[in-house]
């Protein structure tokens, strides 16, 4: 009878421990003097991705937003790997259309300790770097740890620049390319106009006043002959 009670108690403890293997991540966006209005809250989100080894068929993903106007947010009921000293890793991405936030990527670690408790760690994990320091490097760069209690703090770097969401897809030839380059420079445009005038003006004069045009050509030929004669006399 006693052995059956012990067996049932062990089974109950196992079930409780198995079902208790769920994690929670609490965070807060600290905007300092800036207020989190309803407009800002709808344009700010936090995405979570499970990486590394995972016990489920597919890695866990989730997106959450603010719980209140103080900037609190939470990921609850996260699946964790079973076993002593087993670790589960998540990566969190803060994103906002109004602010640039830091850190822009956070590595979160859940570790099952031998005493049955769950240890939560967080590290700043910037874009352009690996999730974990490479083991092949003699002196790998250590990730900077973050405070996780009572929450993980995400801070404001600065306001995001105004984004242009409307772009002209059919750009005119007068604003790009060789033609656009000439039209956008007053000196180049003046040179082109002068060249056109030198070519077109004699044609216009000949059409309007043939006698004057003939006189101009004769004068040009006379000056050319005088030039050659002066060179030959030397």
UniProtKB/Swiss-Prot annotation:
Protein localization: Endoplasmic reticulum membrane
Principal location: endoplasmic reticulum
GO biological process per UniProt: protein transport
Membrane topology label: Single-pass type I membrane protein
Keyword Lyase assigned: no
Parts of the chain on the Cytoplasmic side: 210-234
Regions of this protein lying in the Lumenal compartment: 19-188
Signal peptide feature range: 1-18
Keyword terms: Endoplasmic reticulum, Glycoprotein, Membrane, Protein transport, Signal, Transmembrane, Transmembrane helix, Transport
GO cellular component: endoplasmic reticulum membrane
Membrane-crossing segments per the record: 189-209
Glycosylation sites: 35, 53, 85, 115, 170
Role noted for this protein: Involved in the export of PMA1, possibly through the monitoring or assisting of PMA1 folding and acquisition of competence to enter vesicles.
Family the UniProt entry places it in: Belongs to the SOP4 family.
Protein name: Protein SOP4
UniProt source species: Saccharomyces cerevisiae (strain YJM789)
Gene that this polypeptide is encoded by: SOP4
């Amino acid at each position: 009878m006693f052995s059956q009670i012990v067996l049932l108690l062990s089974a109950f403890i196992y079930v409780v421990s198995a079902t208790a293997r769920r994690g929670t991540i609490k965070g807060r966006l600290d905007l300092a003097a800036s207020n989190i209005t309803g407009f800002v809250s709808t344009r700010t989100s936090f995405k979570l991705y499970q990486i590394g080894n995972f016990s489920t068929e597919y890695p866990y993903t989730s997106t959450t937003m603010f719980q209140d106007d103080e900037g609190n947010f939470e990921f609850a009921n996260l699946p964790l790997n079973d076993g002593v000293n087993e670790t589960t890793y998540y990566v969190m991405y803060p994103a906002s259309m109004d602010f640039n936030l830091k850190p822009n990527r956070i590595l979160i670690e859940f570790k099952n300790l031998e005493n049955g408790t769950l240890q939560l760690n967080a590290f700043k994990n910037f874009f352009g770097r690996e999730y974990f320091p490479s083991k092949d490097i003699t002196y790998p760069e250590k990730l900077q740890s973050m405070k996780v209690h009572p929450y993980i703090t995400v801070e404001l770097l600065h306001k995001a620049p105004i984004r242009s969401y409307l772009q002209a897809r059919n750009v005119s030839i007068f604003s790009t390319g060789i033609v656009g380059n000439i039209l956008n420079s007053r000196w180049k445009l003046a040179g082109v106009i002068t060249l056109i005038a030198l070519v077109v003006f004699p044609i216009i004069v000949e059409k309007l006043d043939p006698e004057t045009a003939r006189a101009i050509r004769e004068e040009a030929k006379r000056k050319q002959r005088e030039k050659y004669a002066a060179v030959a006399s030397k």
